[in-house]
């Protein structure tokens, strides 16, 4: 580029460099989209806009991609590196420029015909200033229409710092030429497909238009389901129809979001400023799969795990910066206090009560509102656990909202609904101290402005945040596979509850929890906490801690928990240095070196972070525990031990493997543990390697408390085969509390009611107990003997003496 064009673009770039601060999506386009910079690249933009072109250029230069203003020279022909699909609107509409895109596409395809070695990568790119979806019955949706020069000037002036450059996966023109030919008709088709691509992409970025709130309420009131519920309300409460209708409107006011793009923009600025000071980084993985779903027109339901109140803001912030529409979020009614409630409502929150029981009008209004969100095409987010995890483990799912999601599908007419499980991880959770108090029996504080301000005042260094998108679950595909007759239940008016609904919802919920855990994120804090809590003194020398982290990292890298889980790329030493900056640990120096200590008062709190990744390490920990206690064991015996205990572990930690997969998992882990030198293999027997016994013992400690808990329940069951389920749960907790006091077990989940409830249910499902109350004494005692061999003699004595003293 030379002469007048260069001067023109330099002059135009002066105001843009001041007004525009754009963001690239994805953050590293060449790496994430697999662009090969050694091969020719050309860019395709939706319409002729020099401002868009220069904004694209800035991002290309920042990411070491070819300059779009530099033409491509191919076989002596000089072609522009960018193509505008449409000439774009003009201030003076009587002038209509000639469309150039088809000619340029044809020129490029023609070069591929004459040069079989040529392969140009065509990269569609859209540049957006502002993301306002607009209102129904309003003017044309600004982000979805092309802007002329004057309109563009005002858009850039006002929205230049809320702009992004969205790179799409490249299209190989070589493949196009080979599969479809190179004539002009193919060039026209290419231009037409590109137009459709950009229209879909913009809809995915801004979402459908927003209704006027009153219009939405009027539509809901006119629905047959709510009209019938209003009549029932009037009849059952002996009130007038108008009063019952006012009750319905009051419930809509309580529930419905009041989405505001301006509030999203303002909050984005505030959060961007805040995150940069509180977090050292927010790590996002597998966002491209969600962008593709949105582009393909799926109705997306985000289903994250729930660690903290911060989840609401963090996930919306991440989605917004991934070029996606922030979802409508189901938030607990406890958050509907001033000023948080009105703010959350404008950020897309709709509020849900803890229970729907006994209020048919409320459940009908909520279900119809949720169905309306789906039918209008808004993305939705809800926490399937129902509340924040106090232990750091996933809670058993609450299936009410999930059930309503499937019922919305049974109304017909919605786009394909896809559930997207999300793992959210932190190196510091601001509520973790409160969680520990609640687990010890303290009453949960009601959310309020003073409590919120108190929490905000404590925010300091929060380390790294992690948002990992798991494997999506298309509901239609799932139902087609598991309930082929589901379409027979479609009813556009009534909320249908076919016989298959409850078991199917339970199965989907369990699958979602497994997929959330599959996307787990190991980090410096949860790895260091796992190692230090494994030591009975909660302290290790720096060398021992480094060695233990190397063990965990090698296990996770060489035998990954799943393809969606993430492990830090940093070395053990770097992770320890980072964790020490979080001020959770103490370092004592002596003449030999550093000792890293987890203070007693911090130990209970740090179990939360250990539990975040307990599922990722439980299998190697269990194997290490079995090998450590037996000193030597055959592969077959090891597998028998693991298979006997696995159903309880799978239910408790939502593990991913089926029973038939265990043999290959055990083999892979045994090979890795042997490679690390922790064990040796002699005559198909696994032996402890005495020179690395400490590392193996610390690895085994990850399963120690779980095995002790199982031993308690199996001992009680074998001692009293006719014990009923509720008594078994209660007595197991009592013994666990005694054990935690006598043996210094600091984990709050050790005697958590939900953990024992889940365990007893699994024992019923596995046939150890039945609803008639009779256990299988021989089988129960066999498992207890196996567990008794895996726990220390003093713990075993405490468990067995607990029942003898009664």
From Swiss-Prot:
GO cellular component, one term: plasma membrane
Protein's membrane topology: Peripheral membrane protein
Highest taxon above the source species: Bacteria
GO molecular function: glycerol-3-phosphate O-acyltransferase activity
Listed GO biological process terms: CDP-diacylglycerol biosynthetic process; fatty acid metabolic process
EC number, UniProt record: 2.3.1.15
Keywords from the UniProt entry: Acyltransferase, Cell inner membrane, Cell membrane, Lipid biosynthesis, Lipid metabolism, Membrane, Phospholipid biosynthesis, Phospholipid metabolism, Transferase
Pathway of action: Phospholipid metabolism; CDP-diacylglycerol biosynthesis; CDP-diacylglycerol from sn-glycerol 3-phosphate: step 1/3
Reactions listed under catalytic activity: sn-glycerol 3-phosphate + an acyl-CoA = a 1-acyl-sn-glycero-3-phosphate + CoA
Main location: membrane
InterPro entries: GPAT/DHAPAT, GPAT/DHAPAT_C, GPAT/DHAPAT_LPLAT, GPAT_PlsB, Plipid/glycerol_acylTrfase
Motif HXXXXD motif per UniProt: ranges: 305-310
Subcellular location: Cell inner membrane
Enzyme class, spelled out: transferase
Domain remarks in the Swiss-Prot or TrEMBL record: The HXXXXD motif is essential for acyltransferase activity and may constitute the binding site for the phosphate moiety of the glycerol-3-phosphate.
Similarity annotation: Belongs to the GPAT/DAPAT family.
Protein's UniProt name: Glycerol-3-phosphate acyltransferase
